[in-house]
Amino acid sequence: MPAATAAPSGARIATYNRVMPDPERPASFRDLTVAAFVDELASGAPVPGGGSASAVAASLGAALVAMVAALSQGRMRWAEHAELHAESAATGRELAARLLDLADEDAEAYSAFAAARKLPRETESEQAARRAAMQAAARWASDVPMATLEACLSVVSAAESLAGRCNANAASDIGVAALLGEAAAHGAAANVLVNLPSVGDDAYAAEMTMRVKRIVDDIQQLAATAHETLGQGESREPLRT
């Protein structure tokens, strides 16, 4: 599972609470109701935005993985896949929690970049400090959606593993998990790529661009396999170990 991304040192970080300083608002998106999060997303505030929305969508996909695995546990018909179901249930829950954290981190990273842009730039030293802060924040704003993208790969991979090896009554649910993971991946990829030009590091940008393409390709292949399996009904070859 992707490691936590670190905030850039030296940058003036404007956190989610500073962007939206209402003391009645919770410090984390996970503490909002679904309706409240949707309202925040629809508001004119800069956060949450597409990056946070992508992470939340992927979190829902991960939760569906956990749900389908749980619905499949203890069923004699699927007993040969009991280990897969146990692992998938745990993995789905872990990914769902991690992706909610990434939704918060995405808002914080954007806020850091917005704060850096507002730094003074009257003197050469101020301009240099502002540029360095913006580049550090842009790197952070690229690293966070990259972590989301990697988590999306884990979500879709888990969904693909369960397709055809789970409770048949939940087949559509695992299909939705794959769809959410794939859609969220495209959103995360877009957020990585849009921030790379502001990092000021061509080698880093090239490496990240290649990683994005590779991961998105892998996700699309896994999702296609999952949907093909689900479209063929309940039959599937057992896992190879």
Predicted features and spans:
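Long, charge-rich low-complexity segments
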Residues: 105-120, 223-241
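A structural-propensity feature for long, helix-poor, extended segments
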Residues: 76-119, 215
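Transmembrane signal-anchor/signal-peptide helices with a preference for the extracytoplasmic
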Residues: 67-79
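Short, hydrophobic/aliphatic alpha-helical segments
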Residues: 29-48, 167-168
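N-terminal amphipathic/basic-hydrophobic helices that include classical n-h-c signal peptides
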Residues: 1-19
